[in-house]
Amino acid sequence: MSMLKRNYVVETIRRAVMLELLAAGKRPDGRGLDQQRELKIETGVIQKANGSALVTLGDTKVLAGVKIATGTPFPDTPDKGLLVVNAEILPLSSPYAEPGPPSEEAIELARVVDRGIRESEMVDLTKLCLVEGKSVVTIFVDCNIMNVDGNLLDATSYAVVSALRTSKMKKYKVEGEKAVATDEEVPVPVATTPVSVTMARIGDAMLVDPNSEEEATMDVRVTITTDDEGHVCASQKGEAGT
């Protein structure tokens, strides 16, 4: 039997077993269809960062670190600071992760998480403006995926949100057209707390927080981000393997 045919047979059997379980309202790890895995959040885990958080969602583990600097605003938003989210799936996090430049999955992950943070207006970027058109505060959030067991979108979002909520930045004073950092530290201006929830459809069943085994057989994945008031800020649809 060729490797291609063998893989097809294995995947067909795996999906059939999954559909049978879901039809009985069960999941491979014993959870209910609407039950999330255990979530643990530790903040302040990186001493040199302005803020950080380590999130464990089941066996998925994500570390987010915040670094804050000053920079030049974009020409179309001269009165707003900058927020940049990056993600890297470490080679040791999964048998399928490879060393080298960020993968398409890592790029999509950063983009979707960034959108949820940005569209919810979690950080008041206008309060990061120091000298309009010339100097603003720039917030960099770097995410390292340390272990992959499904639902990277939610785990990474929780890590970024937790890191930002506990971040401190220098207070600046403006002298003429120059911003000077003081010794005083202030919190990052957080206005709301976005919450990301990811669901997967496998056959006719919808389930919350899919793990890797479930993602391997899912037909569609949907991620929805809401703010403190329950308003939908962002959504993302993807199929298995995306």
Predicted segment positions?
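Polyanion-binding surfaces on beta-sheet-dominated domains and ring/shell assemblies
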Residues: M1-T242
